[in-house]
């Protein structure tokens, strides 16, 4: 009987192990340039025919050496993301990158990347950065923060809420980040909660945030911008 139970556990252990190690699927060939015009729907993109692949599928004149416009952002930041939607050669490679520009006192608001770990390096100015852990057994969510200067590096674990803030009153800041997914996704917390379409019931949000409905209605009436480009 014990032997029988052991063999029943083997597929369960295999399933749990597979789920724990899940990420962007590894490439099974040298190249799989995304064919965005294909009618086939898969997790990611199907491969372009190899005979139609060119060097330009792996190149993008992204101008990441130049500061991006931050004057129109209410958050005071601009995220220029280079993912598989912009660079088809990233398909199946499990990586993307971005440049983030911050106005004085600007921020990249609290957000998560549901499919990626992020590593950031400051290339101009200073940044106050941090992330919050998932719900712990003691009911707490621990905050980890650090002030970074030019050349410093910081990593944000996959799926955790994190932020960056430029503490300077008069100097801009900038960073380059790499992400462990061809399409990491971004969920800006305030935008998702108060700017969803259709809106989340104010009964739900008033209870969740322990405020009255007027406060929720006011927040939902604001313009929640997307600072990702």
Swiss-Prot record:
One of its GO terms (molecular function) is manganese ion binding. It is found in: Secreted, Extracellular space, Apoplast. InterPro entries: Cupin_1, Germin, Germin_Mn-BS, RmlC-like_jellyroll, RmlC_Cupin_sf. The keyword Signal applies. Its main location: secreted. Residues 1-22 form the signal peptide. It comes from the Eukaryota. GO terms for cellular component: apoplast. Pfam families: Cupin_1 (PF00190). Glycans are attached at residue 78. Mn(2+) binds at residues 111, 113, 118, 162. Keywords: Apoplast, Disulfide bond, Glycoprotein, Manganese, Metal-binding, Secreted, Signal. Oligomer (believed to be a pentamer but probably hexamer). May play a role in plant defense. Probably has no oxalate oxidase activity even if the active site is conserved. PANTHER family: GERMIN-LIKE PROTEIN SUBFAMILY 3 MEMBER 3. Belongs to the germin family. This is Putative germin-like protein 12-3. The lineage of its organism: Eukaryota, Viridiplantae, Streptophyta, Embryophyta, Tracheophyta.
């Amino acid at each position: 009987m014990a032997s029988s139970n052991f063999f029943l556990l083997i597929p369960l252990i295999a399933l749990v192990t597979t789920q724990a190690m899940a990420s962007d699927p590894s490439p099974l060939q040298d190249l799989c340039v995304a064919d965005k015009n294909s009618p086939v729907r898969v997790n990611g993109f199907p491969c372009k025919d190899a005979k139609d692949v060119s060097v330009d599928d792996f190149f993008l004149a992204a101008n990441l050496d130049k500061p991006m416009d931050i004057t129109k952002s209410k958050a005071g930041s601009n995220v220029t993301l280079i993912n598989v939607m912009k660079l088809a050669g990233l398909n199946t490679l499990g990586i993307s990158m971005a440049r983030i520009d911050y106005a004085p006192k600007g921020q990249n608001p609290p957000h998560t990347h549901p499919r990626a770990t992020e590593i950031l390096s400051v290339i101009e100015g200073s940044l106050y950065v941090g992330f919050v852990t998932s719900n712990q057994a003691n009911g707490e969510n621990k905050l980890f923060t650090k002030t970074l200067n030019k050349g410093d590096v910081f990593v944000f674990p996959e799926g955790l809420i994190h932020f960056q803030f430029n503490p300077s009153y008069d100097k801009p800041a900038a960073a380059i980040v790499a992400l462990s997914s061809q399409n990491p996704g971004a969920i800006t917390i305030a935008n998702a909660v108060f700017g969803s379409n259709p809106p989340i019931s104010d009964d739900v949000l008033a209870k969740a945030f322990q405020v009255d409905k007027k406060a929720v209605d006011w927040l939902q009436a604001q313009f929640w911008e997307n600072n990702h480009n």
